[in-house]
Amino acid sequence: PQIVNDGVTVAREVELEDPVENIGAKLVRQAAAKTNDLAGDGTTTSVVLAQGLIAEGVKVIAAGANPVQITRGIEKTAKALVLELKKMSKEVEDSELADVAAVSAGNNYEIGNMIAEAMSKVGRKGVVTLEEGRSSENNLYVVEGMQFERGYISPYFVTDSEKMTTEYENCKLLLVDKKITNARDLINVLEEAIRGQYPILIIAEDIEQEALATLVVNKLRGSLKICAIKAPGFGERKTQYLDDIAILTGGTVIRDEVGLTLDKADNTVLGTAAKVVLTKESTTIVGDGSTQEEVTKRVAQIKNLIEAAEQDYEKEKLNERIAKLAGGVAVIQVGAQTETELKEKKLRVEDALNATKAAVEEGIVVGGGCTLLRLAAKVDAIKDTLENDEQKVGAEIVRRALCYPLKLIAKNAGVNGSVVTEKVLSNDNFKFGYNAATGQYEDLMAAGIIDPTKVVRCCLEHAASVAKTFLTSDVVVVEIKEPEAAPLANPMDNSGFGY
């Protein structure tokens, strides 16, 4: 069984028996999924808001209102409220990152502090990844330097046979953007390595058996400290990775296109690393800091590519490259006692991490459903800008729906939602709200009850979009289930047994 407290995971599993009802459920599920894709959190709020807009909208349409004008009113109001939301937003301070993460993880400050610490170590734009840990405790470690998932080609290269790792300090790197087929091509480089007494790491597209055998024999004889790995990535991405490694280590990639061949290569094309550590699955290269200027230029170049990239996957990969170059990826290992707890905990940490990234991007607002309630108070001013009375009814629907999340939070905390709403609105300070964890009315910013602006914005936009589709739909087309054929009766027993 999967025990979760994550809106989108629950919504994905909801399948209703009635096919018409199921289409409605799928629509609302879309609001949660879209918010999850963009902001990574706020899925439950999207569902509650969408339900509020639909429930209020159906009432007025049933009474004879024009659904097209109503949804126009909803759309225009949502757009205007997004602009109001941006005015209410403030930039997130480093001290508030832990609060954002903790609120998203269900008031778990252990997770909140760990994410804040990870961000402080690798920077706000740094890469933080999640892993399933092997113990019951959560752990955080930072991978210094550039790490990628490629291990040594042959176990004969290991220097520590207990740990099965290869470690070299002040190591030279030979970068080759093609397959090494012939050991003779390497003679120049290897002879210079023996003379200079320095270890060498070869990174190539692949190394054929004959060339590899030569390297292994030299390593086992002890005449050469050497190791070889396949270049990370495939196709175009492999070429980019090799260029990144070259910039980090100050080396040159050997490519036929630029007129550099392996047999002519000497120690001038080699890069230098302060340390390299290789295991069966991964390689870590720590630069010696001498190429800082080139690295900074390369990072700026990749940032321009991120702005031009359209797909999220592409952006993610480019961000990873920046983190590897700029030195450091933080890894959070999520620990738990059981498999079920681990899955649930990992989802929470993921939500918290996404919420923190969203807060860094677009800033923060007061949490606990109070920001949506404050936006409801701004609807009256927006009504005056709308064209006709039916659009104003659409705006009124938004105003009512914006109270739903806070009322539900209050109800879940065991208090009357309407009373809480009145009490919060009676105070003009927009930071003032209801803290469901303690049952107090207080300054929520100071209490650390904070939501990322991006999450609240996505909730509002996607709930309005789903409600518009729902309210303007007239008919539903579904498949008719085939009636199941009645099972055949058992044929009469005519074996004659028992007569």
From Swiss-Prot:
GO terms for molecular function: ATP binding; ATP-dependent protein folding chaperone. InterPro entries: Chaperonin_Cpn60_CS, Cpn60/GroEL, Cpn60/GroEL/TCP-1, GroEL-like_apical_dom_sf, GROEL-like_equatorial_sf, TCP-1-like_intermed_sf. It is found in: Plastid, Chloroplast. CDD domains: GroEL. It comes from the Eukaryota. One of its GO terms (cellular component) is chloroplast. Keywords: ATP-binding, Chaperone, Chloroplast, Nucleotide-binding, Plastid. GO terms for biological process: protein refolding. Disulfide bonds: none annotated. PROSITE patterns: CHAPERONINS_CPN60. It holds the Pfam family Cpn60_TCP1. Coiled coil: none annotated. This protein shows ATPase activity. Belongs to the chaperonin (HSP60) family. This protein binds RuBisCO small and large subunits and is implicated in the assembly of the enzyme oligomer. This is RuBisCO large subunit-binding protein subunit beta, chloroplastic. It comes from Secale cereale (Rye).
